[in-house]
Amino acid sequence: MNSRLLLEALQAAETHHASLFEEVRTRSVDIRSGMDNPLLTAHRIEIRQLADQFLAQPIEALPFSAFRLFQVNGSRKEFEKIYFDRRRRLAAFAIAALLEEDAAFIPALEDIIWAICDEYTWCLPAHLNVQDSEEEDDAPRHVDLFASETAHALSEICHLFKDRLDPQIVKRARHEVIRRVLNPYMQLKRVFGWETATNNWSAVCAGSIGMAAIYMIQDSRILMPVLNRVLEAMACFLEGFTEEGACLEGLGYWYYGFGYYVYFAELLKQRTGGRVDLLLVEKKAQRIAEFPQFCFLQENHVANFSDCGRTSGIQPGLFSRLCQRIEQLRIPSLSHRSNSIDHCGRFATAMRDLAWTDYALLKKREGLPLRSEFLQEAEWMVSRCQVNGKLFSFAAKGGHNAEPHNHNDIGHFVWIVDGVRWLEDLGAGLYTRQYFGDERYSILCNSSAGHSVPIINGCFQSEGEQYRSQVVEVGIQDGRDRFLLDLRQAYDVPHLHKLERLFDLDKQQGKLTITDSYDFTESPTSITERFITLYPPEVGKEGEIILSASDGQKLRLMYDARQLNAAIQTAEHLDHSGNAETVYLVDLKSVDTARQQVISMTLEPMF
């Protein structure tokens, strides 16, 4: 859409400004009147409990000692815990003030708005370049993910509560949004790095700024160039997805980035009276909306390649709106709902869970088929089947080792049986300076050492786009799935001429066989087949390793004991929340030094 058409669309609906996001007010009245909706009832109860908890606690200060820790030792969690609790408090009080009659929530909301306006910067220390004196001096006006989100939250609150908040609160909040975010964005003579990014940053930052601008700027002639710039960033965001709609950052970042794309798109649609509808005109966006159908493996378990959690709830507001817009969309089980306000206090998501959730529609769309699928550009394979009443899910990937939020994981896979993740992807680790710096691939969950892939001559996979796989064969049949990858280019190993990995899933018996075929120009010094699990393994009879779950379920890993020696070691993994986990590394080392070797291993449940 060109500038003239955008301006005409904005001007034609300029009088709609007062009714923006009116659906949240309507929904609040419905809930107070006794609307029967189990998802919204749970949402309301959770919000009320959180709001009451915050009412009993003072607003915690953001001390310099916490702010400087990232610069000193790379730690983020101390500052971010306080920072995000403030955003959770903001969201809880705003939603509680909409839903409840308790008069205490408005003064509490005013206090947290005032405290946020007092903050030195809305940007996280991890996103500030503290080595750049010019940027450090302008930290209050630096725009990152969370400065943008804060600007949107405050502008939306001012819009919804302008007649209930003290005028001084509204005036100050609007002033800070303009000073810290809108003016730097509108007046900057060079682009922010995230404006041309093809990851979640472009959508979250631009989408938040776009929504803040829609609320704050009524004059269409001033608003239009801001939204033009936002739309350019949104176009870059869509480029980061494969043509089939896959998000290589993982499902968590799909929720984050695409969520903000949808939030902005829907508000822009309202502001233009339906004349600009990104979800209608962007066909790729519709394919992106279907990505969770591929990613959810069973119940709340997901294919969690890259920096992604192993399980995920659904966001009922976002899914409701997408189901309204896309007829063929299916959703996973409603039994697993995301927290009403997440650990970062994402206001936009919590508000739209309130405003958009359509329980009846979600129930109609609930349930994913037991089928196998392949994403050609992403090189992801997913299989789902049922054997003897048990659900089996398998996911494997090719790709390359410079993907967004990359892990060195070419040829890696996940294996789940009836809710037990036997062969695991560790997912995202604890975010620190080191995690996104030169030490990234020394961290277990990012290195191929922490994935179920071979170790050749003591070498792990290398990072970089040149380290990649090639798909040789994909076979999807009623009783068997096959996925054959050429992994030769994933390793910087001299004399490795060929390495092919075949995944062969027998969907009649629930057996997965992995076969690695090697060809060297000189004899290898070592070949180790590594498997990653969180369940204690023990060597059973010859050629068997048994994994045991606490509920009594067991899995058998079978191999040729004449060809492979088994060894088991443990390692520690810090998950995304900083919790320590014991990881079991099951290594099957070849006793042979022949140049050509074929090694097969089979996984099967013990019924």
Regions found by a protein language model. Give the residues of each.
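Histidine-centered active-site/metal-ligand motif
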Residues: 200-202, 253, 405-412, 451
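Catalytic Cys-His active-site segments of thiol-dependent hydrolases/isopeptidases
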Residues: 423-428
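CBM-like, beta-strand-rich accessory domains located in the C-terminal region of large
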Residues: 127-129, 333-345, 431-607
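Aromatic-lined, polymer-binding surfaces characteristic
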Residues: 33, 40, 80-286, 290-293
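An N-terminal structural lobe/cap that precedes and organizes the functional/catalytic core
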Residues: 66-73
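Carbohydrate-active enzyme catalytic cores, enriched for enzymes
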Residues: 258-422, 477
